[in-house]
Amino acid sequence: MKINANLIRPGNILEHNGRQYAVLKTQIVQPGKGGAFITVEMRDIRTGNKTNERWRTADTIEKCNVEAKECTFLFKDDSNMTFMDSESFEQFTMPNDTLGDTIGFLQDGMVVEVDFVEGSPVSITLPEKVVMKVVEADPVVKGQTASSSYKPAKLENGMKILVPPFLEEGEVIIVNTTDCSYVERFKG
């Protein structure tokens, strides 16, 4: 299906020069002189290489038909993640680098959305929020209330994020997976 370049959004799967790419970032630029154009940062689905392309906003680009399926994450090893299709119970693997830094948010039994192009899995969408345990947090410095201060904390998956000063080691929190930020304490 062909779409105008100005309709490209992060998460789209495009076909360009005979290869399929996952769109990571887009930016529309309107120079003072000349026509507007869009810069697109994208990742080659097969090789994982990142590339940047620039198109005029009126150009047409081939968008791949994507089939989204609900799948359950089973486990990961040194190089692959294993998932199970929730409808057919069929298992498949994907390379660990598909998710990049956010792979630490995957938990056994987590339900995720996997995008398929021509029957092959190409990308994973994590739930927007996940529950994580704080395993390491710096102590609070008393009297430091003049500015809104956040302190670094280490989560059970090894990731470090900034959390409010009242959080302590061992507490369970909710983390936003899109920007790796603290949302709130877990109530439950």
Curated annotation (Swiss-Prot):
Pfam families xref list: EFP, EFP_N, Elong-fact-P_C
HAMAP family on file: EF_P
SMART domains hit by this protein: EFP (SM01185), Elong-fact-P_C (SM00841)
GO BP terms, alphabetized: peptide biosynthetic process
Annotated gene: efp
General function of this protein: Involved in peptide bond synthesis. Stimulates efficient translation and peptide-bond synthesis on native or reconstituted 70S ribosomes in vitro. Probably functions indirectly by altering the affinity of the ribosome for aminoacyl-tRNA, thus increasing their reactivity as acceptors for peptidyl transferase.
This protein's name: Elongation factor P
Homology family: Belongs to the elongation factor P family.
InterPro entries associated with the record: Elong-fact-P_C, NA-bd_OB-fold, Rib_uL2_dom2, Transl_elong_fac_P/YeiP, Transl_elong_KOW-like, Transl_elong_P/YeiP_cen, Transl_elong_P/YeiP_CS, Transl_elongation_fac_P
Protein's organism: Paramagnetospirillum magneticum (strain ATCC 700264 / AMB-1) (Magnetospirillum magneticum)
